Amino acid sequence: MGNITKRGSRDFAADSAVLLEGSLATALHSRLYEAIIKEDCDTIRTLLRNHPVNQPLTLLASSTGYRFLSQQTQPIFPIHLAAEYRKPQSLLCLLQHGADPEVRDAQGLTTLHLMLLNWPVTSTTWTKPSTRIQKILTDIQNNAVLCLRILCDHGAQVNARVDNSNKHSPLHLAITYGTYPVLSFLAQNGAQVNAINESSMTPLHMAADILNKNMIETLIACGANVNCAISSTGNTALKLAVCTASSKAGRLLAAGVGCIRLLLNHGAQVNAQDHEGQTALHEACFGGREVIINLLLEFEANVNILTRNGESPIYMYLQRSSNIRDVTLLARLLYRTYPLRLSNKQGALPAGIMLPEFHLLRETLIKLSKKPLTLEAICKRNIRNVYGEKYKFQLKKLLPAKLWNSIYGIYDFTYLLK
């Protein structure tokens, strides 16, 4: 009985020692946490004598009010804490004491990744902060930039990928989370501007897909390859931009024209084909947005390229009834198309003209497709396709007015299509 009592006393003493040690560790973690947030570098240096700089802090839910409740019991590395909360003095102090900027959290994120994910969103509409709130936001932005500089100056890997299914590089993260100001800084510090993620997309692909003109312009200035194709699909930045701009949302928001023109002005190949043989013009014609189609035609998009399934841009245009109602645009496409192929390799006609309301148009187009053109008409088409909209007025200075009018009188078909 006495042995049992002695053993119980020893166990109680051991448990008490463990509890005491745990409470001391918790107190240490809490003090270091608060010192980092307050940028109290003297206290940070003192506490690091008893806490390894690359060991995570674990805080109880009640130990601090800085983090959200869902995050309070999650371990966090001191350097990650300083980066997330944009505390440049604390970040510098930790790095000077051996903090590893490449240490990763449970989601596979480095310090730089976390910086980008937590980058502040501030307005760019003012030049000088005029209110207290604007000054606070400007200070937050400046602290973020300073933290980024400190990280890069201390060897942060600007090409380290996130250790998850996306495999995003820092540049990909900057595009995803809208941190436009850091793109050029990362590129100047060695970030590979043409790096690909797990989906084989470059940062430019991602910027084009969301029609962010500022990002596109910055990436091109930093050396992005405008004609790089996604290996799985063959899509280029131009094709992605046209796809988004031609969508319902793109039409409603009148978005994307500036992005597409920017890509074309910087050498994007207008007739590049994806793995299915589609060009940007195929995509634009399916969307039916006139301003996009006209822009591609201005840059000499070829209306006669066929997909692997034998579908021309005009075939794509005729797929949708909403497109067919724009007779003027249809006539413009017809006047550039030769030969007129209305069916694909399976012999199927476009779905739009199969609707009962378009049966007269269908018959008219079938007749046109079977009617051979004269040599004169073929020559006029070739001239239009070679010189396009871009150079037609230069051509007007060289040709007799009657001849020029006959070449560019592209609305003659309109009455047949009504």
UniProtKB/Swiss-Prot annotation:
Q: Which superkingdom, per the lineage?
A: Eukaryota
GO-annotated cellular components: nucleoplasm
Keyword field contains Protein biosynthesis: no
InterPro entries for the chain? Ankyrin_rpt, Ankyrin_rpt-contain_sf
Keyword vocabulary terms for this entry = ANK repeat, Repeat
For this protein, the record's Pfam families field holds: Ank, Ank_2, Ank_4
Q: Does the keyword Transmembrane helix apply?
A: no
Q: Where are the ANK repeats?
A: 27-57, 74-103, 131-160, 166-195, 199-228, 233-272, 276-305, 309-342
This protein's name = Ankyrin repeat domain-containing protein 61
Q: Which organism is the protein's source?
A: Rattus norvegicus (Rat)
Tell me what gene encodes this: Ankrd61
